[in-house]
Design a protein with these regions (language model features):
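Structured alpha/beta reader/binder surfaces that contact nucleic acids or chromatin modification marks
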Residues: 9-167, 171-173, 180-182, 189-218
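Acidic metal-coordinating catalytic centers involved in nucleic-acid phosphodiester chemistry
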Residues: 1-5
């Protein structure tokens, strides 16, 4: 079940590349020829190895088809000139990574676009790819944050991840929850309303969540 999978997640390890698709032509070519490509300048040694690629379709280009539905296992990565990617011709000597994909697999659902999406590329892990329902959730950084979100989503459909790389937390209605300094802090319109230790939440998530929720009107 999900509990056994959750215990195995390495939250610092992000080996799923989320690649933004720039056109319907690119989507068709990448799917038909089982590959994805990205400028060498966008990846560093720290991003390697990449084990899977997930295709992100923006709302502006794909409308009702927006979100993430397809992902695939990376078989190999080649460094090539852009002009050598003949499936989508463009004359350029710029260097790209060509990621060859075993086959594109459907998640069986869409990971929905919410407040913010993916401009070029981003990274997540396989667990989040398989269990998240909205794109911002793919950037959750810890088990306790994932567990808190699952509890929160049972109470409200309004919850969203705070769009800030330096903050782990969620916004919903007039409230905000922030994970910092070893604590989970609840803020309302007039400042901090309550807090609990992250360690206490890990030991007793339901009880600690209920303790914070008593302050909220959802």
């Amino acid at each position: 079940g999900i509990e056994s999978k959750l215990k195995k997640v390495d939250w610092k390890h992000r080996d799923v590349l989320i690649g933004s698709v720039r056109s319907r032509e690119q989507m068709a070519a990448c799917q038909d020829h089982r590959f994805y490509y990205v400028p060498v300048s966008m990846l560093s040694v720290d991003n390697m190895p990449i084990h899977e690629v997930a295709l992100y379709q923006s709302r502006s280009l794909f409308g009702q088809e927006a979100g993430i539905e397809y992902y695939g296992e990376v078989l190999s990565i080649e460094k090539v000139k852009r002009s050598e990617i003949t499936e989508i011709p463009r004359y350029s000597d710029s260097l790209y990574y060509r990621l060859n994909i075993k086959g594109w697999v459907s998640l069986g659902r869409k990971i929905e676009v919410k407040e913010f999406g993916v401009q070029t590329i981003a990274f997540t892990n396989h667990f989040l790819l398989k269990h998240c329902t909205q794109v911002p959730e793919l950037f959750i950084k810890s088990e306790e944050a994932f567990r808190f979100l699952m509890e929160l989503k049972r109470k409200t459909s309004d919850a969203s991840l705070i769009n800030d790389d330096n903050i782990t937390g969620f916004e919903f209605g007039e409230y905000k929850v922030v994970f910092e300094d070893g604590e989970i802090k609840l803020f309302g319109e007039n400042g901090m309303m309550d807090h609990c230790r992250i360690n206490d939440f890990v030991r007793r998530p339901n009880a600690q969540f209920r303790g914070l929720m008593r302050h909220m009107i959802l």
